[in-house]
Amino acid sequence: MKQFYRSHFWIAAGLAVAAPVVCLAAKEFSMPKAQPAFSFPAHDHHSNENVTVAVDPYDTPAKEGIFVVKYREHELLPILLIITNDSDSPIELADMKAELVTSDRTKLTPDSEDDIVRRISHPNASGTRYPVPFPTKKAKGGVNSKQMDEIQSAQFRAKAVEPRSSQIGFLFFDVSDIPTPLTGARFYLTGVRNASGNELMYFEVPLDKYLNSQRPQ
């Protein structure tokens, strides 16, 4: 009887240890469900064109949980960009340019795919790194295939927004040496064009709107 209980104990212990590894191995990135831009605290609505732009920083451990890559450990700030077109005509994003301007007027542009891969492949020596408990397949420059899939699929890539619809995706900003990148910062979006090819007025989103919404009421 004692042998029976000992066997079951070790089986249970083995399953308890293996479960986190299996969960970690199975985790994959899934883009958040698209919500209208005006539903986010930090947004700018252009009533003339009926277009709204919003940003939602993923700056907390809870929100960062959707990712495979721990971007904050690599001093990268993911910001979800949401563009909602409530007009009757499509808008074009092919010439769109995004910029994050910090409180000290430092201008940041989104990192490219290669920039992100380079940062993750060659982390700063001072950063804390945790060993992965199982072998992984490398895809590009020290980034495994699951990480590479996420980097490619998470980024905002839409070239247009159809009428009565929204497009979303992440922009990744290098915030190394910037302790509080969001406080007093403003997000600018230019190069959005209407169906006639005319450029819309630039969008300006104060990030303090987001920060204020996170404070306890």
What are these regions (language model features)?
Residues 10-20:
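Bacterial N-terminal signal peptides
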Residues 21-25:
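Sec/Tat signal peptide C-region and signal peptidase I cleavage site
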Residues 26-34, 40-41, 97-104, 133-217:
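Surface-exposed edge beta-strand/loop patches
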Residues 72-80, 167-168:
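Short, solvent-exposed loop/turn segments enriched in Ser/Thr/Gly
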Residues 78-154:
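Mid-length scaffold segments of soluble, non-membrane domains
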